Curated annotation (Swiss-Prot):
Name of protein: Orotate phosphoribosyltransferase
Catalysed reactions listed for this entry: orotidine 5'-phosphate + diphosphate = orotate + 5-phospho-alpha-D-ribose 1-diphosphate
Organism: Maridesulfovibrio salexigens (strain ATCC 14822 / DSM 2638 / NCIMB 8403 / VKM B-1763) (Desulfovibrio salexigens)
Cofactor (UniProt): Mg(2+)
Residues that, per the record, bind orotate: 137
Length: 231
């Protein structure tokens, strides 16, 4: 059902952060940093895939997502919703249901047999497609999905994620250069603010996470990760 209430961004961010912490999707590990496929080293990790197992949480997040999309993009400005393989697919399905729109999903690359399809589902050429994924770090994977959709004839100008790291300075710039505007519900600063307020983690962990958030590039380099933004 299309939402008829539109909470403010601050309320959405705080409640989203609380829910992510409550279901233990948030992990702080400064002593043994996480390594991402992009090459960054990080003391924080978030597992948005876990949300599919919590119906009350995911339903609330989908309501938030639909309200953000309608407010920022428009009520009649999207024709379809496409999920990125694989984590974006369930969220795209729930959002397309909320928005009463057709759904597709896009693979990272063509499957290599049969129709050799990279996109599953149907849309008319020129359709305005919203790309959906669970999260983004530096934004680069969204560009690959958007390019595949555009190659198939879609118009893609917006991408929605539940969670945006919100700390890599070039992420939004990179997306903008690719013709994409990103919408999200919360970022790591929202998580940190709630964690401090509610005392969810010990002070040492919170201090180390804050150091990372203030300077992720140097923190990554000092802990075995990449030290420059990928080209």
């Amino acid at each position: 059902m299309v939402p008829t209430s539109f909470p403010d961004k601050e309320t959405i961010a705080e409640i989203t952060a609380k829910m992510l912490i409550e279901v233990e999707a948030v992990h702080f590990r400064a002593d043994e940093p996480f390594k991402f496929t992009s090459g960054w080293a990080s003391p924080v990790y978030i597992d948005c895939r876990k949300l599919i197992s919590f119906p009350r949480v995911r339903n609330t997040l989908m309501d938030f997502g639909a309200s953000v999309i309608l407010r920022e993009v428009g009520f009649e400005s999207i024709d379809c919703v496409a999920g990125g393989e694989t984590a974006g697919i369930p969220f795209a399905a729930w959002l397309s249901d909320r928005l009463m729109l057709p759904m597709q999903y896009v693979r990272k690359k063509p499957k290599g047999f049969g129709r050799d399809a990279q996109i599953e589902g149907d849309f008319a050429e020129g359709s305005k497609v919203l790309l959906v994924e669970d999260l983004t770090t530096d934004g680069r994977s969204k560009i690959n999905f958007a390019q595949a959709l555009r190659k198939a004839g879609a118009e893609v100008t917006h991408t929605f994620v539940l969670f945006h790291y919100g700390i890599f300075p070039k992420a939004k710039e990179t997306l903008a250069e690719a013709g994409l505007e990103m919408l999200s519900l919360a970022n790591w600063w929202d998580i940190l603010n709630v964690a401090k307020k509610e005392k969810y983690f010990d002070n040492k962990s919170l201090e180390e996470v804050e150091k990372f958030l203030n300077n992720p590039v140097d923190w990554s380099a000092a802990h075995g990760g990449i030290s420059t933004y990928p080209e």
